[in-house]
Amino acid sequence: ACTYYDEDLFAATPSETVEGIASCLDNYWSLDLPFNKKLWDAYYDRFADSKLWMGQTSTAQWRGMQLFEQAVIRSNGDLSLEALSAAMDGASTDEAPGGPAQIVPGTGHCQMNMYVGVNRGGTFEVVQSAEMMPSGQCG
């Protein structure tokens, strides 16, 4: 098992050579989530010939930008460190790959859905999930 394999693995490694490999991540594109579909469709409308999709670092960056946006909104546009730090506490978004995310108040850490996926023929089949896992609960 590995904690960071995503669908981009199959661009570099034939899926049959890693059949059955398990991974635990915050998103797989096989998840039937409305926002995932919206983002996937927008990406492939623009980059139809791409063999790669944005992997886990990109989804984390997306989530971070969405949470930052919510902090800016909550601070009424005050970009001072103090105002943004206060506004980030408890910030949340539903517009993130893999589902919602929230900064746990008082911690500065993000909680989000987590999924265990197993490669079945070049797709990570989600075999287990946990909603809104706080940081540090996975290991």
Range-by-range predicted roles:
Residues 1-139:
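Extracytosolic ligand-binding ectodomains
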